[in-house]
C-alpha cells in the first residue's frame, strides 16, 4: 500500500484491476477543508489518461512490477520474440504491445521489459540506439547557409530528420524517446 502523499511521477498503483502510472500530481491544501492530491493517471495497458483526486493520506495498492532484461532475438511474422537471458524463456509481443519502440529495435538488442502479473506492460529501450541510414536524399554542398535537415530512413524503417551531410550507409545515434538525431557514430 502507498499513501497518496507519497505519489511521485512514475509511481505505479493498482486501481479497478488495472495498473496506472502517475503522470502528474499536485498536493492541494485549501484554506478551508482537508488537503487532497490531484493526479493525472495513465493506464499501463490501454494508454488512456484520466484525472483522479485522492484525499491526503488515502492509501491505495502499489503495483508490483517486475523488470526483466531481455534480448530481442528475431521477428516472426508480426510478432517480436524476446528471450530472457537468465531463464531462456521466450516472450512474443505484438506491435501494439511494443508501442513506438518498434521504430528503433534491432535483432540482438537488449531491452527492459516490465511485467505485471505475467502480463507485459511496456518495453523500455536504452535512451539512444545506433542505426544505419538506408535511404536519404543526397546533400548538395551549398544547400543552406544555416544548416538544415532532411528525412532519412534507418534500417528499422523509421524516419529520422538528419543534417544535410548525412548519407546512405552512415551510422547515426537516435534518441528512442522522441526519434531525434543525436549525432554520427564513428
From Swiss-Prot:
Pfam families per the UniProt record, alphabetical: EFP, EFP_N, Elong-fact-P_C
Major location (coarse): cytoplasm
Keywords for the protein's UniProt record, in alphabetical order: Cytoplasm, Elongation factor, Protein biosynthesis
Annotated GO biological process: peptide biosynthetic process
Keyword Protein biosynthesis applies: yes
InterPro entries: Elong-fact-P_C (IPR015365), NA-bd_OB-fold (IPR012340), Rib_uL2_dom2 (IPR014722), Transl_elong_fac_P/YeiP (IPR020599), Transl_elong_KOW-like (IPR013185), Transl_elong_P/YeiP_cen (IPR001059), Transl_elong_P/YeiP_CS (IPR013852), Transl_elongation_fac_P (IPR011768)
Cellular compartments annotated: Cytoplasm
Gene Ontology, cellular component aspect: cytoplasm
Gene Ontology terms for molecular function: translation elongation factor activity
Record family assignment: Belongs to the elongation factor P family.
NCBIfam families given in the database record: efp (TIGR00038), PRK00529.1 (NF001810)
Name of the protein in question: Elongation factor P
Upper taxonomic lineage: Bacteria, Bacillati, Cyanobacteriota, Cyanophyceae, Oscillatoriophycideae
Amino acid at each position: 500500500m502507498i499513501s497518496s502523499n507519497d505519489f511521485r511521477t512514475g509511481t505505479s498503483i493498482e486501481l479497478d484491476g488495472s495498473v496506472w502510472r502517475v503522470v502528474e500530481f499536485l498536493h492541494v491544501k485549501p484554506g478551508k477543508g482537508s488537503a487532497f492530491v490531484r493526479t493525472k493517471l495513465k493506464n499501463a495497458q490501454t494508454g488512456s489518461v484520466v484525472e483522479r483526486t485522492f484525499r491526503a493520506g488515502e492509501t491505495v495498492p502499489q503495483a508490483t512490477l517486475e523488470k526483466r532484461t531481455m534480448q530481442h532475438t528475431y521477428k516472426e511474422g508480426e510478432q517480436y520474440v524476446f528471450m530472457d537471458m537468465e531463464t531462456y524463456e521466450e516472450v512474443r509481443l505484438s506491435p501494439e504491445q511494443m508501442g513506438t519502440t518498434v521504430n528503433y529495435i534491432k535483432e540482438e538488442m537488449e531491452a527492459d521489459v516490465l511485467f505485471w502479473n505475467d502480463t507485459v506492460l511496456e518495453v523500455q529501450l536504452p535512451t539512444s540506439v545506433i542505426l544505419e541510414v538506408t535511404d536519404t536524399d543526397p546533400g548538395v554542398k551549398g544547400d543552406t547557409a544555416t544548416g538544415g535537415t532532411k528525412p532519412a530512413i534507418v534500417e528499422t524503417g523509421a524516419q529520422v530528420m538528419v543534417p544535410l551531410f548525412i548519407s546512405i550507409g552512415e551510422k547515426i545515434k537516435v534518441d528512442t524517446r522522441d526519434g531525434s538525431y543525436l549525432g554520427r557514430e564513428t
